[in-house]
């Protein structure tokens, strides 16, 4: 098997005991499987939950707290205990664990986005295991990833991972709830995630986590948009992850062979950069952007909204108000209003670097309906 870069996400339900606390036996089982993958020559990045589970007991809570303040306090205590457990377990196999705590704002800045990529790449080159969790102690609702499922998809995307493995306590996706319908049939393979599947999955997670099957499907669809194949399922023992990569996993494989991966710059534009404004284009420009792979020129712009600057990211909508894409502009809003609808040669004097394009094709991302929201 060729060397692969794999992102493994372990949720709270796969790390906890019946009372909701951290289960060290479960944690060691995951570590042993990751260590075995690394011994086979693969790069592995671990996305882990479990900080709240590790911290609520030592903090004096009888059960997992339900308030935001309680969860954040438990996470503040539990994150160091969680990393201590991982570091100790990986050391038994000769591997060094590295902690990275992220918030949504770490992805907004392109410079921080690049620095994160460089840091993780350097850790992998030196044989370490990057262990990533959301910084639950400081994250506020507006800045969170929603759950670590989505965080794992975003990390898998910008690292150009070959596979995203979402480990859970259910062995894959079914056409009905297997806990209530004994006739439910499991999907061994799915080429894509549809709106109907997400709707049917509901939104309720386990008592010890914030996710659920719906969040995993949303994360899987995001990963697929980056060109990353996905596995959702379960397993135990040293070879469970190796078996998943070999196509023998107990779960559902999602995606197509050899998907086209999205460039890191375009990932940042599409999913992470703050959107500073909106440009409306005519039908000719829409067709050029979507069907002919062209750049957006001033002549095709009919309206400009927002107070954006050159090199900001803006949404592009058609004449019906439907978002068709997102891109980095060479014109400030005030200048673009002056030159909209005019030929490029007349407009370029107002452009950053005197470019003829409003948005160059290299700085453009077409957005499908399901990819518009962050």
From Swiss-Prot:
ATP binds at residues 9, 168-169, 210-216. It catalyses: L-glutamate + ATP = L-glutamyl 5-phosphate + ADP. Substrate binds at residues 49, 136, 148. Pfam families: AA_kinase (PF00696), PUA (PF01472). Its main location: cytoplasm. The keyword Isomerase does not apply. Residues 276-354 form the PUA domain. Keywords: Amino-acid biosynthesis, ATP-binding, Cytoplasm, Kinase, Nucleotide-binding, Proline biosynthesis, Transferase. It is an enzyme of class 2 (transferase). GO terms for cellular component: cytosol. NCBIfam families: proB. Catalyzes the transfer of a phosphate group to glutamate to form L-glutamate 5-phosphate. Belongs to the glutamate 5-kinase family. This is Glutamate 5-kinase. It comes from Geobacillus kaustophilus (strain HTA426). The gene is proB.
